[in-house]
Regions:
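A glycine-anchored, Pro-Gly-centered beta-turn/N-cap motif
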Residues: 501, 769, 774-776, 907
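Extracytoplasmic
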Residues: 777-779, 786-790, 794-928
Length: 928
């Protein structure tokens, strides 16, 4: 037996023994997510990475799993105990499939922890909202359930995605999220910390984007913060991002240099082609960019994970022997609970719950009424219930009418003058003289250039498969070939094909339709959409036959906004808004059910309907959960984990990542919104009373009483928000610091205890580069949402008094308090392996608050002027103390020390570095 196989030894010692037995080539074979086998040591081939956003994900119908609600829906439950149960299910089902295929399935990718400061992000459904405390609590519970409670072994190892500031899709492989140390530590990092320090996450995936100029997989804080402070196990790159460092980020000229930067900054495993990684490793070694010790550190980190999974320990690891099943009745029951708990009642004038009399009819109308869509990170459920069928199972088929509300169109070719018809094999030909059943298509128009045509004759989507054919069961693949991009052209329509490169749909000489390179629109490229049926009018006619309408609108999670594509706006598709107007005029008793991956701007819609119920694409139990909620058998209590804005006009540019300076998210934005963070209604009412506080070691204990003053049992999500009233720096207007979902029977009272841990109140002190608890006055507000505050009290809490900046020590420019200037920002220096401040040729200013000036007569400024000469002026408040001219430099990172003579000044004032011209500043230090 090899020493590394001795289960009586500490795992770290066993890993070191294994490394001692490996050859250099064998170690290099373990640097990618496809870890090569080492037969002589009985080490199997191993794959890192199985998706787990909504439970175990296999897109193979032969591998069914329990499909949870979308993560943004799970977050809306505000129920960590439920998250833990869901994590256990995901972990157990991963173990089940790992026993069938032992080389994979246990190193999981998920949950997605990126804070969602902008609802237009294409992957909003994957995240847990905009608040880092909520994200941390919910994902800590989910990952703990996946990992298990054993002190030595892990059921699975979840990897948090995507560290960090990954909240846009456009140009994600090359763009830079411009962030500051405060926004990183207080917002973007903080969201990840909970699942690592207090949860079960032992791995992390670096994001595609850059962080103020440095690719996220080379961020030095992967080592300094994630590993050294949080003690995370290992870090992987996102898919193909290792090679993208050269090909897209252009961070380095060679893959060897990129690998060296990744390894030295804490990234251990490259999610990339193993041959490319191997070649880069040998090149880096030959050039002296890395040592074998660098490889040992990375390989040891990921191999420690494999040891913790019990790969080498047989029955000594309890997770190798515990029962593991998939899609069990217990799993289904927990999943139904999750689907019901994430039902969020946004608006209700009293029509809900529905009070149906015997024989009354319900019309389910709308494009989401008979669908149960999957997004990309979704497994295959063994069953699925849509909203129409959920109601029919409870009310009877004859009592539930249905219409999808889609327009029916025919597509006429300008070239042939004929209509597109569906042949027996599904191929489309522009050859029909008249419109019959084979020429009719349901027009699924999702707006923003995303349309599908659904053939009425065979219930198949039109897809591009060489020629265009009506043969697709559903739009579901990485590339959506059913995607048509309509564009008006005079009185005709042009269709772009699904490809990201410009391609047109054009009629060929044989009458078939093909995708051809984009060119000037000729007759072959022009079509007319001829209306056959007006879907809104048809739906309105059906609505008149019903006593109540359940109008189901929302998004298709594989189109418009998803991975690779951000949402251009917050509006519902135009066809759906037309449908709402027609149906509610036909029947005022219209309940709007929004089935969506993200929030919409529903301001005008809310004025038109008596109730709005929101659900995410909630998995197999969607229809059951909606039906139970509409009928009053489930009392909704979910809360919005992300703000619903009135329109996109209320949002800054999607690339604005500095939430503090830009007043982004509910933390800093005090403007009017549609539904605030934490909003959610109930079928009953609750009263709050008796808020008290008691200081404890490590935090503050709050107690209050919640009374159910209505006639229905229900859950209430009690939320506690904090505000620092006397802080040295700009702090949030409100920040969630504790919450609890409690069940309160009608007419009864429930005591609620909330503990606010100190870490929830800390902020990042840029003067000393650490998170601190600041001494001072704090307001604590308890309520049903961030805007519905019921009780409040103030406390003086112990902590640190933030000292004045010590100008006698180096002051890094990145640690400014405020800045001004059109392009004043931070960038990253590979030479310094740190960030620096820079301006464009219009100049700018960096301000360092409350600096201690002690009659200094000189300063040393490390700066560069990468174009023409620039000038840096040093101020104490409004008083200029001195200036220095920076001569032209070789590059923005060509820092040199420049001596500045100063007028003596004593006292505490803001240090201002006013820059005239294009310049870079790394640090400044004052002296005699």
């Amino acid at each position: 037996m090899w020493k590394f196989q001795d289960t009586s030894l500490p795992m770290e010692e066993r890993v070191q023994d294994l490394l001692a037995h490996l050859t250099l080539a064998e170690k290099i074979g373990l640097l990618s997510t496809h870890q090569l086998p080492i037969p002589r040591l009985d080490i199997r081939e191993w794959y890192i990475g199985t998706e787990v956003a909504r439970g175990y994900v296999s897109r193979d119908p032969e591998e069914p799993s329990t499909v949870f609600p979308q993560p943004i829906g799970m977050a809306s439950t505000f129920d960590p105990s439920l998250m833990y149960q869901l994590g256990e299910i995901a972990g157990e089902e991963a173990r089940f499939y790992q026993r069938k295929d032992p080389k994979s399935h246990l190193m999981l990718w998920g949950p997605t922890v990126d804070p969602e400061r902008d609802p237009r992000w294409g992957r909003t459904e994957e995240g847990y909202g905009e608040d880092p405390f909520l994200i941390g609590e919910m994902t800590a519970a989910y990952t703990q359930g996946m990992a298990g409670e054993d002190p030595v072994y892990r059921r699975t190892i979840p990897a948090l995605k995507h560290f960090c500031a990954n909240n846009n899709e456009k140009n994600r492989g090359s763009c830079s999220a411009n962030v500051t140390p405060r926004t990183l530590h207080e917002y973007y990092y903080r969201a990840f910390e909970g699942a690592v320090v207090r949860g079960g996450a032992d791995s992390m995936m670096a994001a595609y984007n850059e962080l103020s100029g440095v690719p996220a997989c080379m961020n030095p804080d992967l080592q300094h913060v994630v590993k050294d402070q949080w003690h995370l196990g290992f870090v992987v790159t996102d898919g193909a991002d290792f090679t993208q460092n050269v090909l897209m980020h252009h961070a380095f000229a060679t893959h060897a240099e990129a690998l060296a930067a990744c390894l030295k900054n804490g990234c251990d495993v490259m999610t990339d082609d193993e041959d490319a990684v191997t070649a880069a490793a040998w090149d880096a070694l030959d050039r002296g960019l890395i040592t074998e010790q660098d490889i040992d550190r990375a390989v040891g980190s990921s191999m420690l994970g494999r040891f913790r999974l019990g790969e080498f320990d047989g029955d000594a690891c309890l997770y190798n022997t515990e029962p593991a099943e998939t899609d069990t009745p217990i799993h289904r029951a927990v999943n139904q609970c999750a689907a019901m708990e994430q039902m969020c009642l946004l608006h209700n004038t009293g029509i809900l719950p529905l009070q149906l009399q015997k024989g009354q009819k319900v019309a389910v109308i709308g494009p989401l009424g008979a669908e149960n869509y999957r997004d990309w990170y979704t497994g295959v459920a063994s069953y699925g219930v849509n909203i129409r069928d959920g109601l029919r199972q409870r009310l009877g088929t004859e009592q539930v009418l249905f219409d999808d509300g889609y327009d029916v169109v025919a597509v006429q070719s300008v070239l042939t003058g004929k209509y597109c018809t569906v042949a027996e094999d599904g191929t489309l030909y522009a050859s029909a003289a008249e419109i019959g059943e084979r020429e009719r298509f349901r027009c699924h128009d999702w707006d923003f250039g995303s349309m599908n045509l659904y053939a009425c004759c065979n219930d198949r989507y039109v897809t591009e498969d060489g020629a265009y054919r009506a043969t697709s069961a559903t739009p579901y693949a990485w590339f959506i070939r059913e995607w048509l991009k309509p564009e008006p052209y005079g009185d005709t329509t042009l269709f772009g094909s699904w490809q990201d490169i410009p391609m047109d749909v054009a009629v060929q000489p044989d009458g078939t339709l093909h995708a051809v390179p984009h060119a000037r629109p000729d007759a072959a490229r022009q079509f007319r959409l001829v209306s056959v049926e007006d879907g809104a009018a048809r739906a309105a006619a059906l609505a008149k036959q019903a006593d109540v309408v359940v109008l189901c609108v929302g998004n298709h999670p594989m189109q418009v906004a998803r991975e690779c594509y951000d949402r251009p706006d917050l509006e519902l598709p135009a066809h759906q808004k037309k449908l709402i107007e027609a149906v509610r005029q036909a029947n005022p008793n219209t309940v709007l059910v929004v089935v969506s991956s993200y929030p919409y701007g529903l301001g005008e819609v809310q004025k038109q309907v008596p109730a709005i119920l929101y659900t995410t694409h909630a998995g197999a139990e969607l229809g059951n959960a909606v039906a139970e909620t509409l009928l009053g058998r489930n009392n909704p209590a979910a809360r919005c984990p992300i703000t619903w804005y009135r329109s996109a006009q209320d949002l800054p540019d999607i690339m604005e990542y500095d939430i503090i300076q830009a007043n982004r998210t509910y933390l800093y934005d005090d403007g009017e919104v549609l539904y605030p963070f934490g909003h959610g209604l109930s079928y009953t009412t609750f009263a709050y009373s008796n808020l008290t506080a008691e200081k404890k070691a490590g935090g503050v204990l709050f107690r209050l009483t919640v009374e159910n003053t209505g006639e229905r049992d229900g859950d209430e999500v009690v939320q506690l928000y904090a505000q620092a009233l006397t802080s040295r720096v700009k702090r949030p207007l409100r920040q969630l610091c504790a919450f609890q979902r409690v069940h309160v029977p009608a007419g009864e009272c429930c005591p609620v205890t909330l503990f606010v841990p100190q870490h929830a109140l800390e902020f990042y002190d840029v003067t000393r580069e650490k998170m601190v608890m600041e001494q001072g006055r704090y307001a604590f507000r308890a309520g049903a949402s961030s805007a519905d505050i019921r009780l409040e009290l103030e406390l003086t809490l112990d902590g640190e008094t933030i000292p004045s900046r010590d100008l006698g020590a180096p002051v890094l420019c990145k640690n400014y308090d405020t800045k001004s200037g059109i392009a004043t920002t931070l960038q990253f220096s590979k030479g310094q392996n740190d960030w620096y401040g820079c301006t464009n040729d219009l100049g700018g200013e960096f301000v360092f608050a409350q600096a201690a000036f002690e009659n200094y007569t000189a300063a040393e400024l490390w700066a560069a002027a990468p174009c023409a000469k620039a000038t840096v002026r040093i101020f104490a408040g409004e008083q200029e103390l001195g200036s220095v001219e920076i001569p032209p430099s070789r590059s923005p990172e060509d820092f040199h020390p420049y001596a500045v003579r100063l007028k003596a000044y004593a006292g505490v004032a803001d240090l201002r570095l006013k820059i005239e011209g294009l310049a870079s500043v790394f640090r400044v230090q004052f002296g005699a």
